[in-house]
Amino acid sequence: MRFGHFDDARREYVIDTPRTPLPWINYLGSEDFFSLVSNTGGGYSFYRDARLRRLTRYRYNNSPLDMDGHRIYINDGGTIWNPGWQPAKTELDSYTCRHGLGYTILQGEKDGIAAAQELFVPRGDACEIDRLTLENKTAAPRTLDVFSYVEFCLWDAMDDSSNFQRNFSTGEVEVVEGVIYHKTEYRERRDHYAVFWANAPVTSFDTSRDAFCGVYGGPAAPEAVKAGHCSNSIAHGWAPVGAHHFHLTLAPGEKKSIIFGLGYIENPVGEKFSAPGIINKARAEAMMARYATDAQVDAARRALALSLIHI
């Protein structure tokens, strides 16, 4: 059975079905920050060391496979779907995954709404950029609830998957104007944190997995996505996550983009805090400012392409 083909002109492998024999994964990054992205948007991110500086969780032996990752959910009047099919597994009217050199693009369409999820790791920055472009291909206005979702790893991937007696009490986050800072152990013994942001105003958010997915729910059908909104939860221990919610209306033929970023920030020991108990966000704010517009993201994509032109 054929699952895809090479596009020689664009130097991409094009996957035509989400139901590949196993997840087909692209490896993004060439310096310090890396992301593994499958053909359905599964995977994880890390800084330098995949065990000791893991930003997001991934369960290798999970059933179903490849449920953890860089997730976008679209709730269109109660129909919930993902641009890359997983984890909701709602049948799409069309699907394509393009694995390129340093980037992956997931394209899905459902009931006249087209969604493209573009992921890459830019040169010179410790972050993953994830741009979502939505298009209303119908003749009527459409109102959507759109969600982003990642599940944070508590840094040491081995400890994170085994030392539950300790881990259930260490998770810590901070949210400022919709920007989610994962700062587990930052006060005690670490000088680094993760930041998960969007360049658009957030309607609601969640940082507790139980609040977003539901205690008896999961990534296939999160309770917040079904409800059409998050609950602005703040995680204290247990399983911290990052979830943004946007309530959008698209006019006929209109396109809108939202730029998400997942970054790693490390501060010198003497600069950990900007005030007592307040983490120093200066480097995070500078990073977010570098990817605030489509023009900036396009420029970062071009710079990445130029760096790989001789490969």
Write out the residue ranges for each language-model feature:
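Anionic coordination/interaction segments
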Residues: M1-L308
